[in-house]
Structure formats: C-alpha cells, structure tokens
Amino acid sequence: MATIHIDYLGDLRTGCTHLQSGTHINTDAPTDNQGRGEAFSPTDLVANALGTCIITTMAIFARRDGIELAGSALDVTKVMSSEPPRRIARIEIDLVLRTAPLPDDETRTRLEKIAHTCPVAISLHPDLEQAVTIRWEEATAEVA
C-alpha cells in the first residue's frame, strides 16, 4: 500500500498527502531552478528528513534511558553542488540537545553515534557529505 500520494499541480509545484494521517504539504521548485521558492523544495525535504530522523531516533533511544530531549533544536543547511549534475553536495546540521540533567559521557557518546547511523543518514548516497555538530546544554526548568 502506498505511503504518500502526490499530485502535480503545475508550475513546478506538487501537493503531497501522507495517507495514514492525511497530513498535507506542498513543494515548489527553488528560485535558483525556475521555481518561486514558496514551499519546501524536494531537496529541502531530503535535508529536513535527515534532521528530523536524527532527532527522532536520538529521542527514541534517550527515552529508553529516561532522558527527555524536548526543547532541543536543529538548524539544517542544504548546500547544492556547484557543478553538474545538480544534487545536494552537503547537509550541515547544527544540533543543540537540551536535557536536564546532562547525561554522562558514555550515554552522550552512544546518543551522538545515532546522529550518524539513523535510517535516513545510512540511506543517503555516500558522496553526500553529512556535517553534524552536536552541542549539549542543560535544559531550563521551563523545558525539562
């Protein structure tokens, strides 16, 4: 059974529906490739998939150890190749993990390894550079 239904809307745009939940998103070609840039581009969604997979997979494993990662945040930068063929050359992820209390070094190392081995990370082509920076911060009382 299909997971996603995609309609081509014309003018380099698509409408995408997640069939299980009914959630809907649109895509648009980027401005540097004839689009308007008014929605995520397909390559933006690849970069987004890596970031969301990293934090979701880390949170699954953190939860097993009683560690809450709510309040953590990522900034994702997608860098396109300057030479043909057009492709994503690099995805930079700046991840701030906020938790209280901070986990011990062994737990941090185990969780950080997940950033490089989540399902999306290991599914992407090896020529696509994945630059992941992780910083740990103690969560404030409002977040923890």
Which residue stretches match the model-derived regions?
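Alpha-helical metal-binding/catalytic segments enriched in His/Glu/Asp
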Residues: 53-54
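Extended beta-strand/beta-hairpin segments
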Residues: 1-48, 59-144
